[in-house]
Amino acid sequence: MSYYLNSENHLDSGPIYVRENGQLHMVNLALDDVRSSLQKPRPFRLFPKGFSVELCMNREDDTAQKEKTDHFIFTYTREGNLRYSAKSLFSLVLGFISDNVDHIDSLIGFPEQIAEKLFSAAEARQKFTEPGAGLRALQKFTEAYGSLVLCSLCLRNRYLVISEKLEEIKSFRELTCLDLSCCKLGDEHELLEHLTNEALSSVTQLRLKDNCLSDAGVRKMTAPVRVMKRGLENLSLLDLSCNPEITDAGIGYLFSFRKLNCLDISGTGLKDIKAVKHKLQTHIGLVHSKVPLKEFDHSNCKTEGWADQIVLQWERVTLEAMKPQETLESRTAAQHFYGKRARTEAPGKYPLTEAHMNSSEKLQFYKEKAADCHGPLLKHEALSSQESKKSKKRAFEEPEKEQGSSSQTSKQKYVCLAVEDWDLLNSY
């Protein structure tokens, strides 16, 4: 009986309410005249316990919420109260364009002051590190502003950045200084071929130290200058040190750089150094320096321009992508388990392969001033002419002023010959 009552109570749908004489009463069902004691009814809940109501006007992601609050500037008053003010229309428009900078058609003719602010805003949002979109955005700036975006680029020992951001690096125009030292490019690298393009004809300082170059690479680099008088025709400083595959034949290709003032060929595979010194002095007027030149100490080369911080962002992103996924502790534990020797961790930047050369072993050349150009030859001929004139004056005393003035003018004409004239005379 008790089991039956329990089962009925279990299947009971709840209390029954009856209105009688305007009052509401609860009637419990009784089975076989068994009346259960009246129990207090349990209140029904429309929602489960712990339910809370949240008013959601518009469900958006965090970026959309950030955009809504980004329109205001929050400050605190002296009393400590929070005060907000709306940003200027220029700031709002600048932020919107920088978020969509890769969709700009062209920036040619746009004011430089506004373009610099737009570039800084896009850089702060790291738009130039995005694959695809960053390259398109960077090309819009470089084709419109050239050297303002970047006039000097130092990629010394940053071979990972070159391999990952090659197209972005090739988009820079009107560079004047380019440092690619210790990047192991080789003769067939795409960037070495890009150096001969007209977009980099403005380069005046080029450093290719320790890049596994040979005579073939030097020939390829100088071909546009030798054949079509284009390419690196404005080059004034060249560093080819620590490239042992460059021989005497490769140095001969450098004679086409008529504006070259400083040259470093230390650590190359030269056979007849004395003959190379003579050829450099004869053809392009470069004299061997007995002391190291300050132009090759790498103190003046650095990245300059609007995009100087972008290169650092590229390097940081590249290094983070190259980090190993496994931790050092798990690796050492596995090595101890399998009985292997610990592997020495390679540093992020390899040391220079340059041998520690003394100052006497350095082959650095410089061009003397215009008055001292082709110094030994010019001084010798000037001294011989003066001695011959003195002997003539002693033997034939001619006190006429006209002949004296004519000899002085002829001497001035002789000294003021151009460098090309001396090269032509020395070729006979």
Swiss-Prot record:
Superkingdom, natural source: Eukaryota
- Signal peptide positions are none
Cross-referenced Pfam families, in alphabetical order? LRR_6
Return the LRR repeat spans: 149-170, 174-195, 202-222, 234-255, 259-280
Q: Which residues carry this modification: Phosphoserine?
A: 406-407
Cite the Gene3D superfamilies for this sequence. Answer: Ribonuclease Inhibitor
Print the keywords alphabetically: Leucine-rich repeat, Phosphoprotein, Repeat
- Ranges for region Disordered: 379-412
Read off the PANTHER family from this record.
LEUCINE-RICH REPEAT-CONTAINING PROTEIN 42
Annotated protein name in UniProt: Leucine-rich repeat-containing protein 42
Gene source species: Bos taurus
| Gene that encodes it | LRRC42
